[in-house]
Amino acid sequence: MIIRLGFWSIVAIGISIAGCAGPLKQFTYQASELSRSADFTRQNLLSTKMGILSATGVENYRLIIGDSLAKALKELDPKVALVDPNQAVNLINRADLAQDYTLMLREYETSGILRKGILKRVSQALGVRYLILPNLLEYRRDTSTRISVLGVRFVQTRSSTLRVLAQIWDAETGGIVWEGSAEVTLAGEDIREKPIPFEEVALLAWKELIKKLP
């Protein structure tokens, strides 16, 4: 009985310490513009709609990556008119370009090039000149214990790191007019055993990268 009381007393102390610590989130990021054509300016973004292509990279998160990019653009840069990923897919399928579109993205995975002829037809179906291609380069989750008493974990630090790349393609020339990348790490510390939502980290990454647009 004495041992049991002692154990639960320690548990109570541990919970008290964890409660005092409270939920905590730390956010670190790095974003940079990798390249930009000399003639690609802010006016180019505002003068026409921009379509968002299906994301490449880590397959399980492709839909979320594209949707979170659209959401971030609408929040931070609402003056840029968008054709979001869902609208784009519908328009591409309506134009009977599904097979060509799939081929173009598949070729990109190995060559890093979007075939100009298909890119042009896709842009016409979407009614845009510029197409932004999101790419998820890396997604990593880590967990570490900060407060542990007699093997009982009270506070865990969970972190998520995500790296993304975005390219803006000009369908008229078939070239990349802008390219940028961002890496963010979001760490959460509390007594809840809940992972940091992927959507939250992705949205933060895109917001930091969007700030680098012209």
Can you say where each PLM-predicted feature lies in the sequence?
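N-terminal segment of the mature soluble domain
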Residues: 47-135, 171, 179, 208
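N-terminal secretory signal peptides that target proteins for export/translocation
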Residues: 1-3
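Bacterial N-terminal signal peptides
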Residues: 6-18
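Short, structured secondary-structure boundary patches
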Residues: 103-106, 152-156
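Outer-membrane beta-barrel translocator domains and adjoining extracellular loop/strand segments
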Residues: 145-150
